[in-house]
């Protein structure tokens, strides 16, 4: 019986509003994240949403987020490109985006 592997790439093939929003912001070439990168993106998005709420900003600031996280996360180059593409993403849509990423990551 085959077992699941953690190195399977995440492909954003599910057609949900949050996945469409992700693809719109991040572009087609950034539509794949491995599972570790997905968690890094979600961690950064949580921090970004928290900072946006704290400073009453309508959009997330990825540069401020990465600075706030410091060396806690060693972002891969692919992950950095993905996050950079999400700079300025509407803070009000971050939760939906994270749900979409999790839904694809865990095939729910």
Regions found by a protein language model. Give the residues of each.
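Short amphipathic alpha-helical interaction elements located at domain edges
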Residues: 1-108
